[in-house]
A protein has these predicted regions:
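N-terminal Rossmann NAD(P)H-binding glycine-rich loop of SDR-like oxidoreductase domains
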Residues: 1-22
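NAD(P)H-binding glycine-rich loop region in Rossmannoid oxidoreductase-like domains
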Residues: 52-91
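Conserved Rossmann-fold NAD(P)-dependent oxidoreductase catalytic core, especially the SDR/UDP-sugar
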Residues: 97-140
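Conserved beta-loop-beta element that borders a ligand/cofactor-binding pocket
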Residues: 115-116, 149-175
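Flexible, glycine-rich beta-alpha linker
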Residues: 121, 136-139, 164-183
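Glycine/proline-rich active-site loop of Rossmann-fold NAD(P)-dependent oxidoreductases
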Residues: 146, 159, 173-187, 214-215, ...
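A conserved pocket-lining segment of Rossmann-fold NAD(P)-dependent short-chain dehydrogenase/reductase
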Residues: 168-178, 188-212, 216
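C-terminal substrate-binding subdomain of Rossmann-fold SDR/epimerase-dehydratase oxidoreductases
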Residues: 202-204, 210-315
């Protein structure tokens, strides 16, 4: 039995659908918290209230459903975490700790917990960032992701708990909008282009960040989950790379489809400083060698597919 926390979120909402298609709707519990689940998801299979900061609730859900695998998708993202340090600490650090403990106590067999490019910081080599390198993030979100990686590796080594994770870049998708991240501009730009032919970007035009299209993010999460345990040297800290671009490059690519699209810039100092502390591209040799990671989408194919799907969703 599988539990997905954060099932109403950007990644969780698509992951639940994919897992239910593969393993049967009745075998995948959609874990919800504040945001209600989409009606179709609620109707299609089991769901439960899961607030990871509430150990009792987490324990009850895992026991009641006999959960053996958890995909932990709920997290307070970078920009919101900077504005709500307490909540970020509660959810991203205490919540993750609860999950490790409760999983151990209930014989959960596998825990997938994504990390992020935020686990790097201003002292990390910025281009082609190695998998194993300096990790001194200067954001609370980044610190919580380093905590998650290190604790995950600790539980794996000390208790043989099968914890796995990848460092996700900005994820671009058309089904559910991301909230409160720094890379969200890349999704919002498509909404702006389709709705009003314009978008005001909060990052500078030349801010280069790693990005990935949702089908590749889902594939990475599922592929790491089914990778042969014995072939893994890393566990909770895999770089995965698909593409890197700047707001101005993305705008130009969107203009190829919609020539009326106009971009303007009004910089948000908070999100700009977060973006400036992150890598612009990643070396993902470890993921490619240890479990065969390979993305399918590059920037052009992402933009074409995203524009087409979002346009038909919005019109
Ligand atoms: C964010 O912008 O906070 C996230 C991330 C890169 O982890 N999308």
């Amino acid at each position: 039995m599988i539990l997905v926390t954060g099932a109403a979120g950007q990644i969780g909402s698509e992951l639940v659908g994919e897992l239910r298609a593969r393993f049967g709707s009745e075998n995948v519990v959609a874990g919800k918290h504040r945001t209600p689940l989409p009606e179709a998801m609620e109707l299609a299979g089991p769901s439960a209230l899961v607030d990871v900061t509430n150990r009792q609730e987490l324990d009850t859900t895992i026991k009641n459903y006999g959960i053996k695998t958890v995909f932990h998708m709920s997290s307070i993202l970078s920009a919101l975490a900077e504005q709500n340090v307490e909540t970020a600490h509660e959810v991203n650090i205490n919540g993750v700790f609860n999950l490790f403990q409760i999983s151990l106590e209930n014989d959960v067999e596998q825990l997938i917990i994504p990390s992020s490019i935020a686990a790097f910081g201003p002292d990390t080599p910025k281009t082609n960032t190695p998998n194993d390198t300096i990790q001194k993030p200067n954001t609370v979100y980044g610190i919580s992701k380093v905590f998650t990686e290190l604790m995950g590796n600790y539980y794996q080594q000390k208790f043989d708990l099968d914890v796995r994770g990848i460092r996700l870049p900005g994820v671009i998708s058309w089904e559910t909008e991301p909230t409160a991240g720094t890379t969200d501009y890349a999704v919002a730009m498509f909404y702006g282009a389709i709705r009003s032919n314009q978008y005001e970007c909060y990052l500078k035009p030349d801010t280069r960040l790693p990005m990935m299209y949702m089908p590749d993010a889902i594939k990475a999460i599922l592929d790491i989950s089914k990778a042969d345990y014995l072939s893994l040297n890393h566990h909770c800290d895999f770089n995965v790379h698909a593409m890197s671009f700047t707001p101005s490059e993305l705008a130009n690519c969107i203009k190829d489809i919609n020539p009326s699209f106009q971009i303007s810039y009004k910089i948000d100092p908070l999100r700009q400083s977060i973006a400036d502390s992150w890598p612009d591209s990643l070396d993902d040799k470890a993921a490619r060698m240890e479990w065969g990671w390979k993305p399918a989408f590059d920037m052009r194919s992402l933009v074409n597919d995203m524009y087409k799907n979002l346009e038909s969703k919005l019109t």
